[in-house]
Amino acid sequence: YNANPIFVILIFACIPRSMILLAFTFMIQYIVTASQHDAARIAQLTYLKETDSLTRLFNKNKYNEMVSMYYPNVDNITVIFWDLNNLKIINDTYGHEYGDKALSALASVLYAHSDEQSRRVYRFGGDEFVMIIDNPHDGEADRIISAVKDELVKRSSDILIEISSAVGVASGNGSDIIEIVKNADSAMYADKQLCHHR
C-alpha cells in the first residue's frame, strides 16, 4: 500500500477506463445481489414469525403485534370469534390427521373471506380463530358468518366428517380491542353451550 497521491494517479493512468468501469459494474452487481438475498431472507423470517405453520393464517405473534400497535388506532372494529366444534372427538375417532384437515378446512374458508387489508384472520389458539374487521359495513359480519357456515357444510362432504363451529361477535372502538375480543369470545362460548344442548 502506498498513500503517495502521485503513485495513485500513475496507477489509474495505466489502467484502461474500460477496466475500471467493468470493475465498478461487478461491484454494483454484487451489492445489488447481496441486498436482494438479504431482503428475501428477511421476508422469509418475517413470514415464519407471523404465520401459523398448519393453516397458513396469521398466528398469535402477529395478532399480539396488531392488537398492540394497529387496532387501537382504528375507529370501529368488529371481532368474529370462531371455535371448531368437536375437535377432540374428531381426533379421538378418526385420528389427528383428520383433526388437522378439519382445522385447515375452517382456516381456508375464513381466509377466503379475508383480504389482509381490512379483514384479517388469525389462528388464536388450538381450535380458535379470530377475524378482525376494520370499519365494517352494516351487516358485513352477519354475511361473513352465514357464508362461512354454508361453506363448511360443503367442506364436510369433501373430507367426509362434519365440520361446524361456534361463533361470537362483538364490536366497538379500536381502543377497546382487548375488551371487544373478550366479548366476542364470551359470545362464542355461549353459542358453543347452545350447540351442545341441541
What are these regions (language model features)?
Residues 15-53, 61-71, 123:
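Signal-transducing coiled-coil linker helices
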Residues 1-14:
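Hydrophobic transmembrane alpha-helices
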Residues 112-117, 147-160:
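Short catalytic/binding micro-motifs of nucleotide second-messenger systems
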Residues 132-134, 170:
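Short hydrophobic/aromatic beta-strand micro-patches
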Residues 153-161, 176-198:
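Catalytic/regulatory signature loops of cyclic-dinucleotide turnover enzymes
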Residues 47-50, 59-78, 85-115, 122-126, ...:
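Conserved long alpha-helical elements within nucleotide-processing catalytic cores of c-di-GMP signaling
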